[in-house]
């Protein structure tokens, strides 16, 4: 079922690009206004959710059926750890907050990106999106590479420069959610003049293919796991 709505987050990111790009104010003002709105709820829920998990599991823990939750691991000591380690990353209790961490990163780069977007030509944008589109295929290349005999570098299975001492490969700076911001800006600046029939004719097959690929990759074991 999750594969059906996997496109939701990219669509939310695209709406962010539609509404905010190009940034029309200074970096400091933009950061204060946008990131300032995210930090309070991030702080609140990073503290509230572990407390709620702890209270629930110590009240109804015996009835918990989730195979990923061990009520015995929710000790007072672990609760305290969860309450301060959110500064490094989200934890199991706060998994839905991953989106806010990602959104802060996008807000940080948007003023810089906006300066380029103002002077970029249509061809510039198309070239960026083409390279970004290629970068989106990297997870599938990583799945296929071991089938072709690729054994990694010193045990690290990263591609094109990724290794134990470097997490930033060739396509790192063209990868991730930043491309959805540029795609949204491009579609606003150069809108497609398609009929509804053509739009559905193109998008429905793409959605079906995306669903099948996502579903199959999540339910099938990775070639790495079979070696």
Give names to the regions the model predicted.
Residues 218-225:
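Conserved small/polar residues in nucleotide/adenosyl-binding loops
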Residues 46, 131-142, 205-216:
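Aromatic-anchored segments of alpha-helical transmembrane domains
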Residues 68-69, 153-159:
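Membrane-interfacial helical/loop segments at transmembrane boundaries in membrane proteins
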Residues 74-78, 149-156:
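Peri-membrane helix termini and adjoining interfacial loops of integral membrane proteins
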Residues 30-34, 123-128, 196-203:
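Membrane-interfacial loop-to-transmembrane alpha-helix junctions, especially the N-terminal start
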Residues 12, 21-22, 53-58, 77-148, ...:
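Hydrophobic alpha-helical segments with transmembrane-like composition
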Residues 2, 6-11, 23-95, 104-106, ...:
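Transmembrane alpha-helical segments and their boundary/interface "anchor" motifs
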